[in-house]
């Protein structure tokens, strides 16, 4: 019996560790470093209906304990991804989670209705941190009613389970999570980046051309842990946790907080081998701490 295995809707994971969307492309670059079959899953780069060039540069900047990015969902568009990117991933047994983004509800529905055409795609990750252009640019994920409606629309057309990625830039994460669960979401992924800014002292302007960017890396881990714990306290919905994972102890901390699996983002840029390293280290650390299975961890904090 594989004590690292995790079963959640649409995903039979050999282990709970995977690269987060936006930090792994579509896997081709990383496949030169190690066998992608080692991974629990792969969260692929965001896909929109049409190609996107992304935001002007500079769009990445280092910060203390993390980084800022404002990539702007640069991607080659749905047709290219279906024809060229996902076929590459079909050679691996590792389940693919397709990240989907858009500017309107119709954008999401269009991509989600077709992305499951690839036999590699076992689930969808719905990126609801995108600005809703029909409602003044407010992110889909900051309003429970809007998030509910979008999730329901996508569920009506998707051929694979739908996981919704929660934004931390909200006053009440629980109301957002409950609205999404009520709409039929199969799971949650959390958290996305926190909105941040850096100033260049010489130019007196933001370092990021876009002005603000998403803060990721170790700086946001305590926020991610807190929000996962909050949601787990009120729901049994499957959760893939992310936000600042660097070490195997971070992985265990996310699992104890209530996550079923864990995604690694920014650290892939620092160490391309981070995911296989964590997979190797996890059972050893479990032995050291007297942990027999991952399942015993998920509600340990709640039961105290």
Curated annotation (Swiss-Prot):
Cofactor(s) required, per the database record: FMN
Cofactor notes: Binds 1 FMN per subunit.
Keyword annotations: Cytoplasm, Flavoprotein, FMN, NAD, Oxidoreductase, Pyrimidine biosynthesis
Signal peptide: none
Active site: 130 (nucleophile)
Annotated metabolic or biological route of this protein: Pyrimidine metabolism; UMP biosynthesis via de novo pathway; orotate from (S)-dihydroorotate (NAD(+) route): step 1/1
Chief place where the protein resides: cytoplasm
Task of the protein: Catalyzes the conversion of dihydroorotate to orotate with NAD(+) as electron acceptor.
Protein name per UniProt: Dihydroorotate dehydrogenase B (NAD(+)), catalytic subunit
Native species: Listeria innocua serovar 6a (strain ATCC BAA-680 / CLIP 11262)
């Amino acid at each position: 019996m594989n004590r690292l295995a995790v079963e959640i809707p649409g995903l039979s994971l050999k282990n709970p560790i995977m690269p987060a969307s936006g930090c792994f492309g579509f896997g081709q670059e990383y496949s030169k470093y190690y066998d992608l079959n080692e991974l629990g899953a792969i969260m692929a780069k965001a896909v929109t209906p049409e190609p996107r060039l992304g935001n002007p540069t500079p769009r990445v900047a280092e910060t203390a304990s993390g980084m800022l990015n404002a990539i702007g969902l640069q991607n080659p568009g749905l047709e290219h991804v279906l024809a060229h990117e996902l076929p590459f991933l079909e050679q691996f047994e590792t389940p693919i989670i397709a990240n989907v983004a858009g500017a309107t509800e119709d954008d999401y529905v269009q991509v989600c209705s077709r992305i499951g055409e690839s036999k590699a795609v076992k689930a969808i990750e719905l990126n609801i941190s995108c600005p809703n252009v029909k409602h003044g640019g407010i992110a889909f994920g900051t309003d429970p009613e809007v998030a509910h409606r979008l999730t329901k629309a996508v569920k009506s057309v998707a051929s694979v389970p739908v996981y919704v990625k929660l934004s931390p830039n909200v006053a009440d994460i629980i109301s957002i999570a409950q609205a999404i669960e009520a709409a039929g979401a199969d799971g949650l992924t959390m958290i996305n980046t926190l909105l941040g800014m850096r100033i260049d002292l010489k130019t007196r302007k933001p370092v990021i051309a876009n002005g603000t960017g998403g803060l990721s890396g170790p700086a946001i881990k305590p926020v991610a842990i807190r929000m996962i714990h909050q949601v787990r306290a009120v729901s049994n919905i499957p959760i893939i946790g992310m936000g600042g994972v660097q070490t195997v102890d971070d992985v265990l901390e996310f699992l104890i907080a209530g996550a079923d699996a864990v995604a690694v983002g920014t650290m892939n840029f620092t160490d391309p081998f981070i995911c296989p390293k964590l997979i190797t280290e996890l059972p050893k650390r479990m032995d050291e701490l007297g942990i027999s299975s991952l399942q015993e961890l998920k509600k340990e904090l709640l039961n105290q």
